[in-house]
Curated annotation (Swiss-Prot):
NCBIfam families attached to this UniProt entry: hutI (TIGR01224)
Binding residue positions for N-formimidoyl-L-glutamate: Y145, N324, G326
Keywords from the UniProt entry: Cytoplasm, Histidine metabolism, Hydrolase, Iron, Metal-binding, Zinc
Annotated gene: hutI
Protein name: Imidazolonepropionase
Biological role stated in the UniProt entry: Catalyzes the hydrolytic cleavage of the carbon-nitrogen bond in imidazolone-5-propanoate to yield N-formimidoyl-L-glutamate. It is the third step in the universal histidine degradation pathway.
Compartment list: Cytoplasm
High-level lineage: Bacteria, Pseudomonadati, Pseudomonadota, Gammaproteobacteria, Alteromonadales
Length: 412
């Protein structure tokens, strides 16, 4: 056998659902890489003969390989911060009250409109580096802090550039319909409709013309866009060839998840107020449920997502950081594993699936990454742990040892 590298003295959490063992585990295992792909994996005792002198052999010292982690929902590119709003919330103000008073998303818009691409790139690269140090190898980055054509394009260009200058794969999402900008908000519902016209008729075509986005998203909520407005944006995005997803049922239940299911969305995100009808709908459409415990924690929410219903209807559950300056300024995927278990009562295996296999599905990357099996990309992490559950159990001491991305050893 001729391979580019071989890993031995390892255990593997393949996260392959076709395997009967928890985590799709293979103990006392080995793995071989060729041309950036996994060429072989299995029990070390079954490892085919290969040229030991010509092949780099890496010893895992009894650690565990997992798929590279995936953060499937972030707002990584922004300027400024909202520490003042943090203080207001601690004094009793709600997220909605702050937003209606001109804070929230809109307060970040000015900072992003004023910042140039170099400043935004430098800020975002630091955040991406922080995720990468925790084993993240794929990340989704949304726009949504421009709310005008030029700034939305600027944010997406920065996100695309990050992916070109970093080993982490970047999936970009256009979120022009994140909030109603101040210049339209004073006109009431007519202003919101006029802004949706701008998103549909000018922003989306420009984004697609520059190939700046892989998907489009909308914040469907009573403080943002109603169902009709949401459908206009998502339908237009679909027509232009973009994947679609939706912020839905975070603060109330408007039926956004059922709309997302009808339109074939990749995911619905937040979903604290999702009901059984919505769960049934996304189960039938194959739409993923993206859970965002960082926002739940930071906003001190009490309404839990319907985890038992999602399990009952076998909806793929994704865990993501929702890293953003207002509701989840928490740049840590490993912490999301712990929060997913402690706050949402996921099992450690469900949590790990939420940042590997299911996250890949939510981003349309499940034929490439998220599971370790022959033919998939060689995209994995080596951890100094005795069981995969440790990744969710303990936080603060990073157990990451190595990262392989596309067959290339990144971190030692």
């Amino acid at each position: 056998m001729s391979w580019d590298q071989v890993w031995i003295d390892i255990n593997i959490a393949t996260m392959d659902p076709s395997m009967n063992e928890a985590y799709g585990a293979i103990t006392d295992a080995a793995l071989a890489v060729k041309d950036g792909k996994i060429a072989w994996l299995g029990k070390r005792s079954d490892l085919p003969e290969f040229d030991v002198l010509a092949t780099p052999v890496h010893r895992g010292h009894g650690g565990w390989l997992t798929p590279g982690l995936i953060d499937a929902h972030t707002h990584l590119v922004f300027a400024g911060n909202r520490a003042n709003e943090f203080e207001l919330r601690l004094q009793g103000a709600s997220y909605e009250e702050i937003a209606r008073a001109g804070g929230g998303i809109v307060s970040t818009v000015k900072a992003c409109r004023d910042a140039d691409e170099a400043e935004l790139f430098d800020l975002a690269r630091r955040r991406l580096n922080a995720l990468a140090k925790e084993g993240v190898t794929t990340v989704e980055i949304k726009s949504g802090y421009g709310l005008d054509l030029d700034t939305e394009l600027k944010l997406l260009r920065v996100a695309r550039e990050l992916g070109q200058h970093h080993h982490v794969d970047v999936v970009t999402t256009f979120l022009g319909a994140h909030a109603v900008p101040p210049e339209f908000k004073t006109l009431g519902e007519a202003g919101t409709d006029a802004y949706v016209d701008l998103v549909v008729n000018e922003m989306l075509p420009a984004v697609v013309a520059e190939n700046l986005a892989d998907a489009a998203d909308v914040f469907c909520e009573n403080i943002a866009f109603n169902l009709e407005q949401t459908e206009r944006v998502l339908s237009a995005a679909k027509t232009l060839g973009l994947d679609i997803k939706l912020h839905a049922e975070q603060l109330s239940n408007l039926g956004g998840s059922e709309l997302a299911a009808r339109l074939g969305a990749k995911s619905v995100d937040h979903i604290e107020y999702l009901d059984e009808a919505g769960v049934k709908a996304i189960a039938q459409s194959g739409t993923c449920a993206v859970l965002l415990p960082g926002a739940f924690y930071f906003l001190r929410e009490t309404k839990l997502p319907p985890i038992d219903l999602l399990r009952q209807y076998q909806v793929p559950m994704v865990l993501a950081s929702d890293f953003n300056p207002g509701s989840s300024p928490i740049c840590s995927t490993l912490l999301m594993l712990n929060m997913g278990c402690t706050l949402f009562r996921l099992t450690p295996e469900e949590a790990l699936a939420g940042v590997t296999r299911n996250a890949a599905r939510a981003l349309g990357r499940d034929q490439r990454v998220g599971v370790l099996r022959e033919g998939m990309e060689a995209d994995f992490c080596l951890w100094r742990i005795s069981t995969p559950a440790e990744l969710a159990y303990s936080y603060g001491v990073n157990p990451l040892v190595d990262v392989v991305k596309g067959g290339r050893l990144i971190h030692q």
